[in-house]
């Protein structure tokens, strides 16, 4: 872990020096761009920053096509961050590489914003009693998937609006108004689906990993994750047996897989239990459609509501 941190810092230093050498070229490019140049870490953060910024700023993301859990920024990604006015990421809990870059970024012109700063994060299901230390990083004990709960999304959008308002006070009213409009739509989603899930006959759903804990808690549901907090993490044979028994005992009809993860484990359960497969989108990667963030989020709610009714 120390070697990886040192490597990131060395790479960051190299990019910083390279950026200084080409400062005139970067400045010429920035002059043609309206507002601030904002780089974001992955899709949910990008979508929220874009909603709050509207057309005021140039908002981009460095990760778009894969899950954020296994993402490592390339040299070009880091160069893009150092070329930005503002870098926004979700949390140290999720993007540990951002924490490695943070000290050197603080010495540059780039303003670094943690979008979930101040939010209350829940413990990862099953790790509530585990203590940090002896090789266990405290950050890994907390669930970062706040972007799948409409109310948490509204909270994070407001944090982003407040931070951008501090950096760009001339446009504070626009940031705040956009955040309020976005939050109102998020609240409407909660109001729409709360009574639907309250009437649902089935309250438990099985997912490929525990990405939907905040969503489940918000709507009074119970999530059983097949493979823990990461879609790349394989469950043990004992865990698979326990899940098979759970599915049969509670008459689970559907296992929800993810659009950006392997379905090998879920396929094994389908063969052994006879359940069907449906897809929920953890929204870690850009869905590559014309829908708004909240419209993509609502797709998950609609699929769950249909299966649990």
Briefly describe each language-model feature range.
Residues 2-25:
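Sec-dependent N-terminal signal peptides of Gram-positive bacterial secreted proteins and lipoproteins
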Residues 20-309:
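Extracytoplasmic metal-acquisition and chelation regions
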């Amino acid at each position: 872990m120390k070697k990886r941190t040192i490597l990131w810092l060395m790479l960051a230093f190299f990019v910083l020096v390279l950026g200084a050498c080409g400062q005139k070229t970067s400045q010429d490019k920035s002059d043609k761009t309206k507002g601030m140049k904002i780089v974001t870490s992955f899709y949910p953060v990008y979508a929220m920053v874009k909603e709050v910024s509207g057309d005021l700023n140039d908002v981009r993301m460095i990760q778009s096509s894969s899950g954020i859990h296994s993402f490592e920024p390339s040299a070009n990604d880091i160069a893009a961050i150092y070329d930005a006015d503002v870098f926004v990421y979700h949390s140290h809990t999720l993007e540990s590489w951002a924490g490695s870059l943070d000290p050197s970024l603080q010495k540059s012109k780039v303003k670094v914003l943690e979008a979930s700063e101040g939010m209350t994060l829940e413990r990862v299901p099953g790790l509530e009693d585990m203590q940090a230390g002896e090789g266990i990083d405290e950050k890994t004990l907390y669930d970062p998937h706040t972007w799948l709960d409409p109310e948490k999304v509204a909270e994070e959008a407001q944090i982003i609006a407040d931070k951008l308002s501090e950096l760009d006070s001339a446009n504070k009213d626009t940031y705040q108004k956009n955040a309020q409009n976005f939050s109102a739509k998020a609240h409407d989603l909660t109001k729409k689906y709360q009574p639907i899930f309250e009437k649902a006959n089935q309250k438990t759903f099985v997912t490929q990993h525990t990405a939907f804990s905040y969503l489940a808690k918000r709507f009074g549901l119970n999530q059983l994750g097949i493979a823990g907090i990461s879609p790349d993490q394989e469950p043990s044979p004992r865990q698979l047996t326990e899940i098979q028994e759970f599915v049969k005992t509670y008459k689970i009809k559907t296992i929800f897989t993810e659009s950006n993860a392997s379905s090998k484990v879920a396929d094994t359960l389908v063969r052994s239990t006879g359940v069907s497969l449906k897809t929920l989108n953890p929204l870690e990667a850009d869905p590559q459609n014309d829908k708004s963030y909240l419209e993509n989020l609502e797709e998950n709610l609609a699929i769950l509501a249909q299966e649990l009714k």
